[in-house]
Amino acid sequence: MVLIRVLANLLILQLSYAQKSPELVVGGDECNINEHRSLVAIFNSTGFFCSGTLINQEWVVTAAHCDSNNFKMKFGAHSQKVLNEDEQIRNPKEKFICPNKKNNEVLDKDIMLIKLDSSVSNSEHIAPLSLPSSPPSVGSVCRIMGWGSITPTKVTYPDVPYCANINLLDDAECKPGYPELLPEYRTLCAGIVQGGKDTCGGDSGGPLICNGQFHGIVSYGAHPCGQSLKPGIYTTVFDYNDWIKSIIAGNTAATCPP
């Protein structure tokens, strides 16, 4: 069974795959408190349900399938029980999804750009992560992070974000496990071939950081998470650089690559 990595209380789409319930990084450890300064917690009245990445003081990138009504974003968070003094909360002022996205295909152009209602300030636990300067290289060691469940089959939510190292894999290593993937979806395949480390449900929208660069957005994967031969699927950020820059520059009619 395959799920998109979102909330448990969202309705499951009756498609060839289902949306993922919120779970966290499986096979990881608690993140260092200072290593996830760009990680954004997206939440509503039910709690955290997605993550995002701060790319400058006014803009966040996440997955399009994380879009919902009445959500807020928390910056500088680590423990859900012990607040950092520099935590900041913002509302979305504007949300941008590719106008040429195929609405009936969740994997297609699974990226959303959010303008904040006011800018955030850099601090000890808050700093943006810039867009990638070049495409990622197969074999790169990549970092994943999030507040999702730390167990693959039942929901076990941690109070802190978990992190893990995985590898960027060749698309050919993903195709057998995900025959529905199409080249035009512009995705990356990353994980551990033998399984055991993976993003999961509530990690949707969070970053895949390879060699210090923001290369992917958590999008899609198998359920249970962390299966062998079924790595995670991530939206390729580099392919959307021009669209993101155009929107930020004020060209709100810009379209994404086909």
UniProtKB/Swiss-Prot annotation:
Proregion positions: 19-24
Molecular function terms from GO: serine-type endopeptidase activity; toxin activity
Signal peptide extent: 1-18
Lineage top rank: taxon: Eukaryota
Coiled-coil region list: none
Residues annotated as the enzyme's active site: H65, D110, S204
Domain Peptidase S1 intervals: 25-249
UniProt-listed Pfam families: Trypsin (PF00089)
Record-linked InterPro entries: Peptidase_S1_PA, Peptidase_S1_PA_chymotrypsin, Peptidase_S1A, Trypsin_dom, TRYPSIN_HIS, TRYPSIN_SER
Enzyme class, broadest EC rank: hydrolase
Keyword Cytoplasm listed: no
Annotated glycosylation sites: N44
GO cellular component, one term: secretory granule
Enzyme Commission number: 3.4.21.-
The name this protein goes by in its record: Snake venom serine protease PA
Species: Trimeresurus stejnegeri
